[in-house]
UniProtKB/Swiss-Prot annotation:
It is linked to Neurodevelopmental disorder with dysmorphic facies and behavioral abnormalities: An autosomal dominant disorder characterized by developmental delay, intellectual disability, speech delay, hypotonia, behavioral abnormalities, and non-specific dysmorphic facial features. Some patients have variable skeletal and cardiac anomalies. The modification Asymmetric dimethylarginine is found at residues 93, 97, 109. Consists of two polypeptides of p32 and p33. Identified in the spliceosome C complex. Component of a ribonucleoprotein complex containing mRNAs and RNA-binding proteins including DDX5, HNRNPH2 and SRSF1 as well as splicing regulator ARVCF. In vitro, self-associates and binds SRSF2, SNRNP70 and U2AF1 but not U2AF2. Binds SREK1/SFRS12. Interacts with SAFB/SAFB1. Interacts with PSIP1/LEDGF. Interacts with RSRC1 (via Arg/Ser-rich domain). Interacts with ZRSR2/U2AF1-RS2. Interacts with CCDC55 (via C-terminus). The RRM 2 domain plays an important role in governing both the binding mode and the phosphorylation mechanism of the RS domain by SRPK1. RS domain and RRM 2 are uniquely positioned to initiate a highly directional (C-terminus to N-terminus) phosphorylation reaction in which the RS domain slides through an extended electronegative channel separating the docking groove of SRPK1 and the active site. RRM 2 binds toward the periphery of the active site and guides the directional phosphorylation mechanism. Both the RS domain and an RRM domain are required for nucleocytoplasmic shuttling. Residues 16-91, 121-195 form the RRM domain. The modification Phosphoserine is found at residues 2, 133, 199, 201, 205, 207, 209, 231, 234, 238. Changing residue 89 to S: In a breast cancer sample; somatic mutation. Residues 198-247 are annotated as: Interaction with SAFB1. This is Serine/arginine-rich splicing factor 1. One of its GO terms (molecular function) is mRNA binding. Changing residue 93 to A: Predominantly localizes to cytoplasm and fails to modulate splicing of endogenous pre-mRNAs. InterPro entries: Nucleotide-bd_a/b_plait_sf, RBD_domain_sf, RRM_dom, RRT5_SRSF_SR, SRSF1_RRM1, SRSF1_RRM2. It comes from Homo sapiens (Human).
Length: 248
């Protein structure tokens, strides 16, 4: 097999770009996508497969936190007998930059600050177990559709925002009073309601997230940013607009 070409999207920021080394010689762009797609929306995969040298790649995500999750989750990952080296490029990351994807300006976003992409298609979830993280919640709610934001609070409640209104409606109808399992194995039956003036989260700050404090013990950390559903079949990399739920 031969290496894939360069499939470029709009220029991004260095915080979103990661280096992937120690790749097998027959690696393809699609193979790299298969390794990293679950961490978030991928903007660009640049595979370098030069004669006389081992291949390496740069993967650029839409959101810097997705890139960070990918580094934590895939550095040292065994891929067909090759232990991947995944890190931020040596040229350096930016030091906390403003949010992207939703306009410029404003205060710089902290390392674990809220994402820039938000939606009004919001549900409130209650009854979460103490170890439930926003990644767990996002995984659970993806059964209903494309999730663009998820967060949890210390009181066992959380919010989830969907890209489409019909997915929000489906979540309330199908996921209310369903069994939720955290990454630590705790289970609970959760309630799912449309957000509104009477809900616990209405008008509440999203800054009290437990999202990162527990996530580093998980090899498959998830991001709060939008991750489109994925369908397999294309031999080349392209941004996905449909994706099945995965807990692998």
């Amino acid at each position: 097999m031969s290496g894939g070409g360069v499939i470029r999207g709009p220029a991004g920021n260095n915080d979103c770009r990661i280096y992937v080394g120690n790749l097998p010689p027959d690696i393809r762009t699609k193979d790299i996508e298969d390794v990293f797609y679950k961490y978030g929306a991928i903007r660009d995969i640049d595979l370098k497969n030069r004669r006389g040298g081992p291949p390496f790649a740069f993967v650029e995500f839409e959101d810097p936190r997705d890139a960070e999750d990918a580094v934590y989750g895939r550095d040292g990952y065994d891929y067909d007998g090759y232990r991947l080296r995944v890190e931020f490029p040596r040229s350096g990351r930016g030091t906390g930059r403003g949010g992207g994807g939703g306009g410029g300006g404003g205060a710089p976003r902290g390392r674990y600050g809220p994402p820039s992409r938000r939606s009004e298609n919001r549900v409130v979830v209650s009854g979460l177990p103490p170890s439930g993280s926003w990644q767990d919640l996002k995984d659970h709610m993806r059964e209903a559709g494309d999730v663009c934001y998820a967060d949890v609070y210390r009181d066992g409640t959380g919010v989830v925002e969907f890209v489409r209104k019909e997915d929000m409606t489906y979540a309330v109808r199908k996921l209310d009073n369903t069994k939720f399992r955290s990454h630590e194995g705790e289970t609970a039956y959760i309630r799912v309601k449309v957000d509104g003036p009477r809900s616990p989260s209405y008008g509440r700050s999203r800054s009290r997230s437990r999202s990162r404090s527990r996530s580093r013990s998980r090899s498959n950390s998830r991001s709060r940013s939008y991750s489109p559903r994925r369908s397999r079949g294309s031999p080349r990399y392209s941004p996905r607009h449909s994706r099945s739920r995965s807990r692998t």
